[in-house]
Design a protein with these regions (language model features):
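S-adenosylmethionine-dependent methyltransferases
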Residues: 1-216
Length: 216
């Protein structure tokens, strides 16, 4: 059983605050990354989960604005430290969060407890060998498209686990890997693209939401 006390004993953390639809969320992040990096191969399994990506912030806001339906099941893959699923659950969605990295899962569980979502289902999921029960009305993910070797497992997972007529939403900043995967998706999915721009005093970042449904 997960223990918040044991979590604090195991990890050094810092807290980031996010405000979504006037509601504050306090999210624990690793204070240092060195313990999660292999010094002999820094690019292998780099802890991409250990920060809140702008795409995750945009996806969280999208789900907060989406009318919840208790009869619909949502699934998040590659959930990292848990922001998206925590926001979705807070705004009434029935969502299951999944992640593969064990440390990320611990942070997600801690964040769920801190943000009054102790009953949020948080599960380990290997995209290459998924063990999900049933199908989902909506599958969401943010910034999961980096490695070409993940493309085929992702497509198989989506096709196997989205309900007929269900939707998949992928959020990411614009990069080449996303464009490559977009080309692969087009043969199996109808795709609608929504662009969101996050602006600050110093810059602007465009985040793309790929909204996809399996072709008939």
């Amino acid at each position: 059983m997960f223990s918040l006390e044991q979590f604090y004993q195991a990890y050094e953390t810092e807290t980031a605050e996010f405000v979504i639809k006037a509601k504050k969320f306090n999210i624990l992040l690793p204070r240092y990354l060195y313990r999660f990096i292999n010094p002999t191969d820094m690019l292998h399994d780099f802890p991409l989960w250990a920060k809140i990506w702008k795409a995750s912030w945009v996806l969280s806001g999208y789900l907060a604005d989406l009318q919840p339906d208790v009869n619909k099941r949502l699934l998040e893959i590659g959930g990292g430290v848990g922001l998206v699923s925590i926001v979705a659950a807070t705004f009434g969605h029935k969502i299951t969060m999944t992640e593969y990295n064990a440390d990320a899962l611990n942070f997600a569980r801690a964040n769920a407890c801190l943000n009054q979502c102790p009953d949020l289902p948080i599960k380990k999921l290997d995209w290459n060998h998924p063990s999900l029960r049933g199908r989902f009305d909506l599958i969401v993910a943010s910034e999961v498209i980096y490695r070409e070797e993940d493309f085929s497992p992702l497509i198989r997972l989506f096709k196997s686990n989205v309900k007929p007529g269900g939707e998949i939403i992928l959020a990411s900043e614009i990069r080449k890997s996303g464009k490559d995967l977009f080309g692969l998706f087009q043969s199996d999915f109808d795709i609608f693209v929504v662009k969101k721009t996050l602006r600050s005093e110093t810059d602007a970042t465009t985040v793309v939401l790929l909204k996809m449904r399996l072709k008939n």
